[in-house]
UniProtKB/Swiss-Prot annotation:
Native organism taxonomy: Eukaryota, Metazoa, Chordata, Craniata, Vertebrata
Gene Ontology biological process terms, A to Z: cardiac ventricle development; gap junction-mediated intercellular transport; immune system process; MAPK cascade; positive regulation of inflammatory response
Phosphothreonine modified-residue sites: 80, 290
GO CC terms of this entry: cytoplasm; cytosol
InterPro entries attached to this UniProt entry: Kinase-like_dom_sf, MAP_kinase_kinase_kinase, MAPKKK8, Prot_kinase_dom, Ser/Thr_kinase_AS
Active site residues of this protein: 253
Enzyme class: transferase
Record's protein name: Mitogen-activated protein kinase kinase kinase 8
EC nos: 2.7.11.25
SUPFAM superfamilies per record: Protein kinase-like (PK-like) (SSF56112)
Binding site for ATP: 144-152, 167
Pfam families: Pkinase
Amino acid sequence: MEYMSTGSDEKEEIDLLINHLNVSEVLDIMENLYASEEPAVYEPSLMTMCPDSNQNKEHSESLLRSGQEVPWLSSVRYGTVEDLLAFANHISNTTKHFYRCRPQESGILLNMVISPQNGRYQIDSDVLLVPWKLTYRSIGSGFVPRGAFGKVYLAQDMKTKKRMACKLIPVDQFKPSDVEIQACFRHENIAELYGAVLWGDTVHLFMEAGEGGSVLEKLESCGPMREFEIIWVTKHVLKGLDFLHSKKVIHHDIKPSNIVFMSTKAVLVDFGLSVQMTEDVYLPKDLRGTEIYMSPEVILCRGHSTKADIYSLGATLIHMQTGTPPWVKRYPRSAYPSYLYIIHKQAPPLEDIAGDCSPGMRELIEAALERNPNHRPKAADLLKHEALNPPREDQPRCQSLDSALFDRKRLLSRKELELPENIADSSCTGSTEESEVLRRQRSLYIDLGALAGYFNIVRGPPTLEYG
């Protein structure tokens, strides 16, 4: 995530206000406010045209000049996956300049949780868009969060009341791959794509929202995760990867910010770098992924397979158990702006595995980080690993985050007088006065308490890392 300074006093005041708003209350207020007002008009940003000689571009532009309707661009409607992919290919093959001439929004919807009205789906009248509340970081009011590929908003359909994540991508940066994988492959551990709508020169992707934030947000706010929490997350991630890999899909960007908490599961997000292999080995034309989690074979760019995701998961496990990505402690970012050479020469980062890691979990991480991809286990094999299937007596009583929250609420009710007054706040502050032992003893029960409305630690879906 990047932060861009605006230097505007007015913007500072707005950001400061947003940081203290309750998103649920804002949505309720705005819903009542706009009920009797005229729909707001969406103003597309003015962007310069990028000339292109692509034949599809020329065809679309000639139709626009002649005043004829272009397929997929006449309205917002329900459709099939094939319709959505055709829509995505069409808008990615037409220069953004011509979308400024469109009289209204257009798009394809896959799920009826989004309810267009007479072929229209307008901001503020049909759907509300609210910036994510920044719940974890105190970054100062002079900064605006900005993701690498687009901004993400909390969206609520005014008719169905469904709350969603809405990712905004400038049309000149939009690629069909941004929707292909989520549209074509449905699984409980993959964030569901509800549809895509083009407003002006910005594509809006509506998808399933995670109530509990991302793994990265939890790590940055509350420190390292306990091993049973890691087991819970890892099993859900591996189920998603097992499904993707069975379809020969490489995610290419497994990392904490792309794993998002739901109340009863964890899901994978951000498939913009994903590819579906046609052969046993994928030969890349570019470097894909986040380098700190990249496998050695990905860095070499000589071909890799779905096993690259397994290595990235191993690096992610180190991050979850230590609170720090691999390599960073031994090679500070200030001295090493790139880790590609280090990974190429020294991988795997076994020295970064937590000192208090159990033997079983250490064995699993070492297997996932095997340098030779041919010796690296598949997702299905790791799901059977004993580290992820401890004896019943060693497992926590909770089988989901919701049941965990209920158990924790009862415990806190009984021992309320014994708890420090600032326990909820301290779990988010990351105070240096606390010992590492106490930080690791905290569990997802408290950290994700807001899922059931018990605490105010995590509020709503993930921020800009959601993808």
